[in-house]
From Swiss-Prot:
Gene that encodes it: Pabpc1
Keyword Cytoplasm attached: yes
Subunit structure and binding partners: May form homodimers. Component of a multisubunit autoregulatory ribonucleoprotein complex (ARC), at least composed of IGF2BP1, PABPC1 and CSDE1. Directly interacts with IGF2BP1. Part of a complex associated with the FOS mCRD domain and consisting of HNRPD, SYNCRIP, PAIP1 and CSDE1/UNR. Interacts with PAIP1 and PAIP2 (via the PABPC1-interacting motifs PAM1 and PAM2). Interacts with PAIP1 with a 1:1 stoichiometry and with PAIP2 with a 1:2 stoichiometry. The interaction with CSDE1 is direct and RNA-independent. Found in a mRNP complex with YBX2. Interacts with TENT2/GLD2.
Family: Belongs to the polyadenylate-binding protein type-1 family.
Spans annotated as CSDE1-binding: 166-289
Protein name in the entry: Polyadenylate-binding protein 1
Modified residues (N6-methyllysine): 299
Domain RRM residues, every copy: 11-89, 99-175, 191-268, 294-370
Subcellular location: Cytoplasm; Cytoplasm, Stress granule; Nucleus; Cell projection, Lamellipodium
Positions carrying Omega-N-methylarginine: 385, 419, 432, 436, 475, 481, 493, 506, 518
Amino acid sequence: MNPSAPSYPMASLYVGDLHPDVTEAMLYEKFSPAGPILSIRVCRDMITRRSLGYAYVNFQQPADAERALDTMNFDVIKGKPVRIMWSQRDPSLRKSGVGNIFIKNLDKSIDNKALYDTFSAFGNILSCKVVCDENGSKGYGFVHFETQEAAERAIEKMNGMLLNDRKVFVGRFKSRKEREAELGARAKEFTNVYIKNFGEDMDDERLKELFGKFGPALSVKVMTDESGKSKGFGFVSFERHEDAQKAVDEMNGKELNGKQIYVGRAQKKVERQTELKRKFEQMKQDRITRYQGVNLYVKNLDDGIDDERLRKEFSPFGTITSAKVMMEGGRSKGFGFVCFSSPEEATKAVTEMNGRIVATKPLYVALAQRKEERQAHLTNQYMQRMASVRAVPNPVINPYQPAPPSGYFMAAIPQTQNRAAYYPPSQIAQLRPSPRWTAQGARPHPFQNMPGAIRPAAPRPPFSTMRPASSQVPRVMSTQRVANTSTQTMGPRPAAAAAAATPAVRTVPQYKYAAGVRNPQQHLNAQPQVTMQQPAVHVQGQEPLTASMLASAPPQEQKQMLGERLFPLIQAMHPSLAGKITGMLLEIDNSELLHMLESPESLRSKVDEAVAVLQAHQAKEAAQKAVNSATGVPTV
């Protein structure tokens, strides 16, 4: 964005709890009635490009953002009520806990909106959330007020009150570290004792008799089932911590009716789960450490290889502690694991056995990795590869193969598509970043100075990537687009033939017109090239457009300049669909659009394809609406 443009620190909204299929266009339709929007961005996973369930909507005016927050919070989009709050970019303010309260023992029927409506009487709410899982509400939630005073008023008035006939607890929000510290302090001063494994013949009186010798007890209870039969465990609550500690020390592990009983501090369910989880994680970490560097992963196994054969093949390299072929339904899955007693033996086995043919197949042998490690490693490799590809403007290719223009990437390597924010056309003029390249001249083509060389045609992206645009909602303009060259056959065209076909040679600058891609500049020591006169694209009533004019314009203006010249031509062919088709065509690369402006046949071909795509989309929408109306499902 232009640094001189005004900033709107409080005109940005966070929109959460989104359905995975919600797009920027849907959010634009939803929020645009509140006021002019600068941009919309649905946050997505870098690799899978799936929605993360939240988005940011940036308004031009804070008053419009406030109106949207007041009137649209908890509105339903694609069957899910969305949660809107002010975007707070400073994490210290979000995590400080100031103004944040915790509410528990909530009725299952209380949702985000009901909680918001209940607590909004005490002050301005920044965020409000009932914690849910796949089964619905978990019975607790959080409300973050703008001020600490509002939070204290809510605690004072609402703690112990009835909400939907349930007495709720309302208190100051405490971080996990604070809660664990409090639990630890309380645990040291426990008075409640848990006893288990004492059999079915135990009752309250007998349990009191057993533990009464340690000190006065407030309560004694043996837990029973519906028939009154003991469940084998119970509780004794002492008056003093010292008596409880003495009972645990003396009674834990003693035999009672031929059974060894357990006596310990009574724990809440959350405490027990936390402790078990911690023990499990510790065991898991110990196991990982123990097998680090000694466990091998073996794949591409022949179907006839079993555990014994696998052990036999690897036994020459050292002492094997375990060998296992993974099976499913009695059949080998084609891979297994071999664990050695030392890392040296495992390393030797990898060196000797990787690639060796056993039975009928060459084995793949490597150190075993946990799933998380493997995924992290693959992701890291992928990101490094993408970074290296982006760093090289033109990958080294066969000199006789037509080279892609500078700024394009070879399609043989998969590319991530970094989706940009959604910019309405009314705001594009305000979002003009400075050009990232010199506009004095185009980068010379690698074949330019070779006499008689074949000049490759610029690759044209397949039209199937275009999507129909709504007349009310503009297209999402991606700031980084990768040309797909693998699906397009590029026909070589001799320079002489090209010169004969056209009165003047059109030299299109080898740039990918995208705001997020840094185009390479000419080398300082490069030989000066003869600048050939570029033909201008003439559209009646418009200023002539040349490739150099386009290159010197800011990125957002480039599409506008092209759109202004495309629209009258398309309007002459399809007056009612001109706006939609123009928006669809503007997703094509600028060099291709220039060619279409010069070639009426090429333009007509693309327009016909766009009309076909648009008609197919409209037919699909009509069919979906018919299905929804027949089944009574409301359309969003």
